[in-house]
Amino acid sequence: MITLSKSQEEVFKKLAVELSMSKLIEACNKSVDFSSLNSNEQLDVLKVTNAFYRSAEQIINDSTYDAFLSEFSTYNPDHPYLLTVEPEVLADSKTVPLPKKMLSTDKAYSFEEIKKWIDRLLKAAIEVGVSESEIQIKVTPKLDGYAAYDDGISLYTRGDGARGQDITRAFNKGLQVANNGDRGLGPGEIVIKKSYFDTVLSDKFENSRNIQAAIIAEKKVDESIQKAIDVGACVFFPFLSLENWIGHYTEILVDFESIVEKMWSAVDYDIDGVVLEVTNETLKEHMGATRHHHRWQIAFKVNAESAEVKVLNVTPQTSRTGRVTPVAELEPTKLSGATISRATVHHYNMVKTNGVGPGAIVQLVRSGLVIPKIEKVIKAVEPQLAKECPSCGTHLIWESDHLVCPNKTDCPAQTENTLVHFFKTLGNNDGFGPKVIEKLHEFGIKKIHEIYELKQESFVSFGFGDKTAQNLVEQLQVSRDVEIEDWRFLAAFGVSRLAGGNCEKLLQHHSLDSLFEATVEDLVQLDGFAQVSADAIVEGLANIKEEFLKLSALNFNLTITPKASEKSPGETPVFGKIIVFTGAMTQGSRGDMEKQAKALGAKVAKSVTGKTSLLVTGDKVGANKINAARDKGVQVLSELDYLALISTY
C-alpha cells in the first residue's frame, strides 16, 4: 500500500497541481484505473511522480510510470509534456545555460518498435546517399542514475535540456570519473555500483537514487556516502566511456536479444534498458532531433517483473562457436503471465564468482524480452561448473570468462548450430530449423553441401513424410534461386569476426573467390579491420574454404557487392558526388545505372535534398521537380548527358 511520506507531501504541495493527494495515491496503488482519469488528472499524476523520482522520493517503479506515460500519449500524442525533456525538480537554485543541449531519448518497448526505427534509418540513408554497408549501430547500457553534463570545468544537471543547475560541488566532494577517466567528456550519469550498494548501503538506504541526490545536494553528505565516493563506488560515468557493442544494423535484426543481454550484463550499475544509436555522422545530421529527443537514437526499455527463485541445477549448453552457456534450471515460477523454469546465466565465470548452483536463490526478471534473466544472486552456494561438453564429452577449457569445447570437428552441438546458422542467415528459405537439422545430423549429415545433395527419397528414408520431404527439397532449390547479397552468403558460414557488415566491407575490395587469398596484412590495410580481427578472419576463411567452394559450385543467385572505386577523385567526374536518378530511363534500368554510379565512386540517393550533387532525369519528369532541384543548387542532367559525362569511364 503506497502512502506519502512527509517529504513527499512537501514536494506535492510545491507543485501546486489540481489533482488531489487522495486521487494520486489511488492511481499509484492502482485502486483507480489510470485510464479512467481525465487528461488533466493523468498529466498531474505524471508530473508528481516524475517530481518524486527526480527528488529521490520515488513512489512508483519505472515500468508503472512508463505505462502511465504510454496511456497518456495514446490520446495526447502532441502534448508539450511529451515533446520536451521531462522537467527536473531539484532545489530552488538558479539555472544556467548548458554547454550543449541534453535531450531525452525516444523509447521502444518491443522488437517491432526497434525494427520500425531501423526502417526510418534506412529511409534516411537513402535520402542522403549513405550506403547500407555504412549503417553501423552502437548499443550501450542505459544507466539508471542522475543525468549530468561535464564540460571539464563545471558539472551541470540536465534540467529542461537547455538549462540546468551547476552541481560542480559533487566533484568537490571527491566524486571521480568512472574508470579513472578524464573530465570534460560531456553527458553522463552519476551512479553507484550495484554490488557495493547491495552489500554496504542497502540496509541504510532504500535505493541508490537517495545517494545520488545526496551527492549533488549542497549540504555535506552522510559519512557512508562519502566513503562510497572515496572508494570509487560512486562515480560520474560519461556515456562516451560506456561498454558498447557496435555492428552492422542487420546483426541487430538477427541477434537482438543476445546483444541486449550482453549489454545488460556489461556494467555493475543499475540500468533500465539499452540505448541504440546510428554511428554515421551524415545520417545523424540528416535525421536531426525533435525538442524532446534525437531521431537517430532510441532506448529499448522493458517493463519488468521480478521474483526470488531457487536454483535446482545448472545445465551446460554448447553453442555454434563452442562456447558453453550455463542455463539455470529453476523452481517453476509465475512471472509476467508465464511459468518460468529456466534462465540463462551470462557465462560460467558469473556462475563461478557469484556462487550459482543447486540451492542458490536468485532474483529473476522477465520483461519485454522473451528470455528471462537472472538479475542478481541473493543467496550464493558452491558454484556448479561444467567439466565436459554436454554434447560430445570433450574436456572443456577456459577462454576468458567462458568455458569452451575445443572439439571443432565432431561436436554434435557445434555442427548442428552451424547448419542452422547457415539457413537462418540466408533468410530466403523455410524449413531448416533446429529440429530438422537435428534429425539430419542423426543420419550422419555434418556439412551444408551434404544437405544440398539430398533427394526427396533421402529425406523420406530419414523419417520425413512425403509432403515434408518434397517441401524441403523445394526449399533447397528456393535458397539457390532467390537472389541474395554475396555478403549475406559469406556471413552464413559463421566465420568469427565476419558478420554481415564486415562481409560487405571486405567484398568491396575482394571478390568472393579472391577473398580466400587475402592475407592478414591485406585486411589490416582496410578501414575497420584491426590485427586481432584480421587474424581471426584469415584463419576462419581457411577453415571454411573447402565447404565454401563446394557450395559456390551450386550457383546460388548472388548479387555482387560493388567494388570500392580504385580511381582517384580526379579520374571520375562523379566520384564522391550524391546522385539521384529519376524518371524512366531508356538506355538501361535505373537499378543498373545506380550500380554503375556506385562503382564510379558516387553515392546514390532516392530523393533530392540540399546535399544532392546531381539529378539525372529520364522520361516523364515534371518541370516542378527539375526546378525545385535547381532552386536547391543541384545540377540537372538528362540521361544522355549523364551517359556522355561518364562515357570514358
From Swiss-Prot:
Entry's EC annotation: 6.5.1.2
Gene3D superfamilies assigned to the protein according to its UniProt record, in alphabetical order: 5' to 3' exonuclease, C-terminal subdomain (1.10.150.20), BRCT domain (3.40.50.10190), DNA ligase/mRNA capping enzyme (3.30.470.30), Nucleic acid-binding proteins (2.40.50.140)
Catalytic site: K142
Substrates-to-products reaction catalysed: NAD(+) + (deoxyribonucleotide)n-3'-hydroxyl + 5'-phospho-(deoxyribonucleotide)m = (deoxyribonucleotide)n+m + AMP + beta-nicotinamide D-nucleotide
BRCT domain: residues covered: 569-649
Binding-site residues for NAD(+), renumbered to this chain: D62, S63, T64, Y65, D66, S104, T105, R158, E189, K301
SMART domains in the record: BRCT, LIGANc
Tree of life domain: Bacteria
Homology family: Belongs to the NAD-dependent DNA ligase family. LigA subfamily.
Annotated protein name in UniProt: DNA ligase
Organism of derivation: Psychromonas ingrahamii (strain DSM 17664 / CCUG 51855 / 37)
